[in-house]
């Protein structure tokens, strides 16, 4: 029997950190009940994870098989490619404000609106490319607020590597790290062509030393949703 479909709620609220109205996409599973507590999956690139990643469908199927704990998804869409870079890139003009938005505004919103666990292990950050970057960097800034990070082909630069090196209070984090073996010539949104594989290997070496629960999953593919979509399920099964 095919799993039932949950519901997607569109929630709007004004972010003081970003000084703009934010739209959130909240996925509640088909058997959602306020009588139970739920893990919260916070997805950067919210529209992409729902449409291209089909994350709602994958969570629903895992729940129907009882392969993950009860979970809701909060997707944070981006307005356009330029705005995405400004908020997700370590050198972006809104990067710091966006991290504060996640920690100081989105998390309290989720805890107020839904029956969540309200502790770090009950929150998972997930993102692809730059979305994975800002997920990791947010968790490094707020290590007690988040317990799990799923990184799909993260963009890694000197800022990311240095942040990991300087982070001493992250041993408790659980990280699932995916990168394609063919991501050697990735066309970025600012017009450059970058090798993602070598920086991710450097990141792997650092995280292996820092964490007790770290999974590195190379896959035979490149920087596309074609490869990321089927890799969401195994990551969720491990983290939830």
From Swiss-Prot:
InterPro entries: AB_hydrolase_fold, Esterase-like, Mycobacterial_A85_antigen
Annotated coiled-coil segments of the chain: none
UniProt cross-references to Pfam families, sorted A to Z: Esterase
Superkingdom, natural source: Bacteria
Descriptive protein name: Uncharacterized protein YjcH
Species, as recorded: Bacillus subtilis (strain 168)
Encoding gene per record: yjcH
């Amino acid at each position: 029997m095919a799993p039932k479909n949950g519901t997607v709620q569109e929630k709007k609220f004004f972010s003081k950190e970003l000084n703009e109205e934010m739209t959130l996409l909240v996925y509640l599973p088909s058997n959602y009940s306020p009588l139970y507590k739920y893990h919260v999956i916070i997805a950067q690139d919210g529209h992409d994870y729902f449409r291209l990643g089909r994350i709602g469908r994958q969570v629903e199927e895992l729940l129907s098989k009882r392969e993950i704990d009860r979970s809701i998804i909060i997707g944070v869409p981006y307005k356009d490619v330029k705005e995405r870079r400004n908020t997700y890139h370590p050198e972006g003009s809104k990067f710091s404000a966006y991290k504060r938005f996640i920690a100081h505004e989105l998390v309290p919103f989720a805890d107020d609106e839904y029956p969540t666990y309200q502790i770090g292990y009950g929150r998972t950050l997930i993102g692809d490319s730059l979305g994975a970057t800002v997920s990791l960097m947010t968790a490094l800034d707020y290590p007690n607020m988040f317990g799990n990070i799923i990184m799909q082909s993260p963009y890694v630069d000197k800022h990311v590597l240095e942040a990991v090196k300087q982070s001493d209070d992250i041993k408790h984090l659980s990280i699932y790290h995916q990168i394609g073996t063919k991501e050697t010539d990735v066309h970025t949104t600012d017009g450059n062509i970058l090798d993602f594989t070598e920086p991710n290997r450097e990141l792997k070496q650092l995280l292996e030393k820092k964490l007790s629960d770290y999974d590195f999953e190379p896959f035979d593919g490149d920087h596309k949703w074609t490869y990321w979509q089927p890799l969401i399920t195994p990551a969720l099964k491990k983290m939830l």
